[in-house]
A protein has these predicted regions:
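Active-site-proximal segments of metal-dependent phosphoesterases and phosphodiesterases across multiple
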Residues: 304-305, 310, 328-371
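Active-site environment of divalent metal-dependent phosphoester hydrolases
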Residues: 193-197, 223-226, 253-262, 296-300, ...
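Active-site neighborhood of phospho(di)ester-bond hydrolases with catalytic His/Asp-centered motifs
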Residues: 186-189, 214-220, 248-255, 337-341, ...
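Hydrophobic h-region of N-terminal signal peptides that target proteins for export
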Residues: 46-55
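Acidic, histidine-bearing metal-coordination/catalytic regions of metal-dependent phosphoesterases
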Residues: 34, 54-187, 208, 409-432
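Acidic/histidine-rich helix-loop elements
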Residues: 103-118, 148-164, 186-202, 223-226, ...
Length: 432
């Protein structure tokens, strides 16, 4: 097999001159010095050729060890996230759900890129764009392992390998749509590293695309975010095993996701439409505002080791919220739902009080129908006008390790809470 190389940065004149200077006193001729230099050069090239060939031949195709799962789904796009066992370049192929075989024709490809350059790594985030609202699409994920030669900036690839669409059906998902008559989603929170309970309450027998439009985790899915492995084992892997390859998953950060050595990387695994921990979702004429309440204690509390600045973060978020509630999407929605992990309380802990001070006055002007929270590890329903919360809309706190099924109809919002013991709470709220 021929090996072609492009060698740069070698100055043969310098090498010959140096050899001539060192050996001149020994009486060697210029021809002999040139011969020695060329022999060394050829030996070097041969060694590089053998090493490169061996390395390239030894690259194994990557394996997917986490994911894929759907993030940041909207009416025209969604993002697919997954992890491979080695550095790779990645892409997603997408086909309409039109009854043809996936191999019927070349499918549109979308690549993991940043500023125009393909990303080499183990985590892959591919945004699929230009889609139709309320439409089902099939997709597959593909990878090629990469070996980098840093001196020459060369890449050597393994054979490409993708999710199986020959023996198995491709992954299937559906975009959101404002034309949906009813919105159905499931919410969970405060599982605190209990993947077995998560899989029980959000099993694939329960969470299906026909029953649910999306799933939302409302914070504290882990207790302290110490490592990537913990996040995968406690949240990502059980979600993928049950529903997340085909039902969109959204995340609202809780105060416990802000803690731990790996906390700053949390949204590397859960990209959002805004690139921030706060964002919006629009589906079926319902406008969702997902907020981040930050930590529950003051920034200077000894528990945070001087690593947090959530007071300023919440102020920035409040400025964003002012723009959001005045947007046409919010004003023209038939219903408005706010998601935040920590509930507001003017007399509560610092985080609760700051949420009440900064967010509630803005939301009170936005005709909000319902706020959904977690954090307190028990069920609580606060009526509109509650003096402690200060809101002119009802607030529901979902218990820890429970699933809340929410259905937004034409004139009311119905929710049912189910815990691991199959105990249920049901209630309904009129839409303004």
């Amino acid at each position: 097999m021929a090996c072609n190389f492009e060698v740069t940065g070698i100055t043969s004149d310098f090498a010959t001159h140096r050899s001539r200077k060192v050996c001149a006193n020994a009486g060697f001729s210029d021809k002999f010095l040139i011969f020695v230099a060329m022999r060394r050069f050829i030996a070097l090239i041969f060694a590089l050729c053998i090493a490169t060939f061996a390395a390239a031949e030894g690259i194994k195709a990557p394996k997917i060890i986490a994911g894929p799962y759907i993030q940041a789904c909207s009416q025209s796009e969604f993002t697919v996230v997954w992890q491979t066992d080695c550095d790779a370049v990645s892409w997603v192929e997408v086909a309409p759900d039109d009854g043809t075989h996936f191999y019927n024709t070349a499918r549109e490809q979308f690549f993991h890129t940043i500023h125009g350059r393909r990303v080499v790594g183990r985590w892959h985030k591919v945004k699929v764009t230009g889609l139709d609202a309320g439409t089902s699409y099939r997709y597959r994920v593909l990878n090629k392992a990469v070996l980098l030669n840093p001196k020459n900036d060369r890449l050597y690839y393994s054979e490409g390998k993708g999710s199986d669409v020959y023996r198995r059906k491709p992954y299937l998902m559906r975009t959101l749509s404002d034309k949906a008559q009813t919105v159905r989603f499931a919410m969970g929170n405060d599982f605190h590293d209990k993947p077995e309970v998560l899989e029980q309450l959000f099993s694939k027998e329960i969470i299906t695309p026909k029953k649910y439009d999306f799933v939302l985790y409302n914070g504290d899915m882990v207790s302290i975010l110490a490592s990537e492995e913990q996040l995968v084992q406690s949240v990502i892997a059980p979600s993928v095993a049950q529903f997340a390859t085909q039902v969109p998953l959204y995340i609202a950060r809780g105060n416990h996701e802000t803690r731990g050595e790996h906390a700053v990387a949390f949204y590397d695994y859960f990209p959002t439409s805004t690139g921030q921990s706060y964002y919006t979702i629009s589906h079926g004429g319902v406008f969702f505002i997902v907020l981040d309440g930050g930590e529950d204690k003051p920034d200077n509390d000894i528990e945070y080791y001087d690593l947090v600045r959530f007071d300023n973060y919440r102020k920035q978020e409040a400025e964003w919220l002012k723009e959001v509630v005045n947007s046409p999407e919010c004003k023209n929605a038939r219903a408005r739902v706010v998601i935040i992990h920590i509930p507001p309380s003017s007399s509560g802990w610092h985080g609760e009080a700051e949420i009440a001070r900064l967010f509630i006055p803005i939301l009170n002007s936005a005709n909000i129908d319902l706020m959904l929270c977690g954090h307190i590890h028990e069920y609580r329903f606060s009526e509109a006008g509650d003096a402690i919360c200060g809101s002119n809309f009802p607030i529901v706190c979902n218990p820890n390790r429970a699933r809340m099924d929410v259905e937004v109809g034409t004139d009311k919002i119905v929710y049912k809470i189910t815990n691991a013991n199959a105990e249920e709470i049901t209630n309904e709220i009129s839409i303004k």
